[in-house]
């Protein structure tokens, strides 16, 4: 059984069976067409700044995290247009509790939500992991998160701030038997009264990761405590 990012890598690799050169070309064209488009008017403080999002070539497709949203979390943030969020509690409801725990846990956190990029033409997920309340610093959470995964190297940590939150971010290489060469991945962590939250962006390969990076940056810029 695969766990954590290893499972994500297998998910991404299997998805290539349905991807083609035409798909790659189409989504490249779509990304170019979307560059410069403004976001729709949004409630104050609830959405990313339209000009900022447009400058990054990504539009907001809504906000998750608050009560009543697709995923209820200790934080809230904007997700990119066409990306689809699903609560892992819903996705794993048919699995025995002990199996679900092994399948979705990595280090101090467990997957609570995943945002699928496939509807937007990419192969990968933005996954949100949550943990029990405690006093661990965000960087320590990230170090334990990556320490639970084999194949991680060249970690580069840095602090970041978003609204009322301060946290840590890491860019690193992940090597798997399913890939020909190491690929770039990213994760960030913040501490909340309800426990740590980790946002992780993988991808089929480094090229896919970079193509999805604007969606990750949108989530990071608009991250707020719920």
Where are the language model's segments positioned?
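Short, well-ordered beta-strand elements
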Residues: 195-204
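Calycin-type beta-barrel ligand-binding domains and close structural analogs
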Residues: 150-156, 188-189, 198, 217, ...
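Hydrophobic/basic alpha-helical segments enriched in Actinobacteria
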Residues: 83, 170-174, 178-181, 185-189, ...
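Conserved polar/disulfide-associated segments of primarily extracytoplasmic proteins
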Residues: 72, 88-183, 189-193
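N-terminal targeting sequences that direct proteins away from the cytosol to non-cytosolic compartments
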Residues: 1-103, 204-226
């Amino acid at each position: 059984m695969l766990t954590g990012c290893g499972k994500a890598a297998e998910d991404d690799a299997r998805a290539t069976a349905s991807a083609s050169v035409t798909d790659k070309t189409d989504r490249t064209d779509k990304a170019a067409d979307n560059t410069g488009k403004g976001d729709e008017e949004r409630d104050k403080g609830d959405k990313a700044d339209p000009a900022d999002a447009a400058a990054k070539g990504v539009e907001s497709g809504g906000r998750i995290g608050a009560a009543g949203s697709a995923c209820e979390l200790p934080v809230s943030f904007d997700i990119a247009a066409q990306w689809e969020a699903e609560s892992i509690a819903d996705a794993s409801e048919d699995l025995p509790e002990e199996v679900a725990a092994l399948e979705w846990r990595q280090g101090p956190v467990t997957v609570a939500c995943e945002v699928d990029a496939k509807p937007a033409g990419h192969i990968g997920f933005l996954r949100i992991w949550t943990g029990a309340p405690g006093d661990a610093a965000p960087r320590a959470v990230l170090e334990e998160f990556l320490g639970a995964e084999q194949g991680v190297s060249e970690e580069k940590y840095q602090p970041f701030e978003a609204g009322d939150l301060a946290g840590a971010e890491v860019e690193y290489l992940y090597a798997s038997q399913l890939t020909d060469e190491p690929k770039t991945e990213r994760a960030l962590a913040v501490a909340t009264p309800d426990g740590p939250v980790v946002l992780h962006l993988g991808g089929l390969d480094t090229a896919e990761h970079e193509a999805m990076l604007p969606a990750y940056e949108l989530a990071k810029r608009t991250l707020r405590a719920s």
